[in-house]
Amino acid sequence: MTNIRKTHPLIKIINHSFIDLPAPSNISAWWNFGSLLGICLIIQILTGLFLAMHYTSDTMTAFSSVTHICRDVNYGWLIRYMHANGASMFFICLFLHVGRGLYYGSYTYFETWNIGVILLFAVMATAFMGYVLPWGQMSFWGATVITNLLSAIPYIGTTLVXWIWGGXXVDKATLTRFFAFHFILPFIITALVMVHLXFLHETGSNNPSGLISDSDKIPFHPYYTIKDILGILLLMLVLMILVLFSPDLLGDPDNYTPANPLNTPPHIKPEWYFLFAYAILRSIPNKLGGVLALVLSILILMLFPILHMSKQRSMMFRPLSQCMFWILVADLFTLTWIGGQPVEYPFIIIGQLASILYFMIILLILPTISLFENKLLKW
């Protein structure tokens, strides 16, 4: 009798993706974040679905509907905070996943990498629109400030902003369309994830050494399924500690005040996971320049395959590049901190220096060091 797992048209796809998939024998815990991101996406879609059952996307009732979810719906508070903090866990896993890709040279699979960058943009767009939905002060003013940046686009900017708003200001039309987009985007993300995996399975996974591992492969199940389950348990542990002990730790107190177009909050800032990009945006005095820097801060990831100058793929055996990589990580932490600070001395200058350093390391220092390391090894 033939095994249904290997013959059934649908089940064999799952089999080739998660069971009989040949995987390198030496991939470390850094390779767990792909599956963790998948779990995060599932959590977000499920909690989001249940929230959408009780949420109303109308300026008059949006804030009250969120309060109603937290007070009156069975375990509504749990669903709401799992969704809000699930987004933070999603971004933590995303940043670590991208960082792993940079460190171990996974960007040389450039189709997989570029789809990944598009996914990052899609997740950021989804998170931004989701933050607008509770219709608190920071929701309203965040939406106003960020959408207003598009007015910096020459010629069509002002028209574009009014078109996105659906009126003269952020209002009912804006909230309704943001809810519609926030609902549809995760499903588009799911489709992109499938494309991401399809491209990855064309080449197989990279590994810490960056060397070809075709001669030493092991089946994904049971080795990496059990390893992924451990990762998922740890992810759920951290998420539930956050949700049950300090659900508002990463949120903004201003968002517990209903949106008021007549009263601007003293410090408008996005959620923590956007602060590094927000700091880069603010460090350039020109509006259009700031918007370009903001977009390029993420888009620059697509240049990594072109800027790879080393004869080795991974940074595992390249101490100078490793050193520069960790300086880049420290720089991103600095930018995140600056993004949450008011626009005044000394934060302005620190932000500007950190922004310059960010682009310098990626565009100039890392490729130069890679060439220097090739010379040291007489390659």
Curated annotation (Swiss-Prot):
UniProt GO MF annotations: metal ion binding; ubiquinol-cytochrome-c reductase activity
> Which residues are listed for heme b b566 binding in this entry?
97, 196
Q: Does the keyword Heme apply?
A: yes
* UniProt keyword Hydrolase, yes or no: no
Q: Which cofactor does it need?
A: heme b
> Could you tell me where this protein is found in the cell?
Mitochondrion inner membrane
Q: Where are the transmembrane segments?
A: 33-53, 77-98, 113-133, 178-198, 226-246, 288-308, 320-340, 347-367
Q: Other remarks?
A: Heme 1 (or BL or b562) is low-potential and absorbs at about 562 nm, and heme 2 (or BH or b566) is high-potential and absorbs at about 566 nm.
Role played = Component of the ubiquinol-cytochrome c reductase complex (complex III or cytochrome b-c1 complex) that is part of the mitochondrial respiratory chain. The b-c1 complex mediates electron transfer from ubiquinol to cytochrome c. Contributes to the generation of a proton gradient across the mitochondrial membrane that is then used for ATP synthesis.
Q: Which family does it belong to?
A: Belongs to the cytochrome b family.
The name this protein carries in UniProt is Cytochrome b
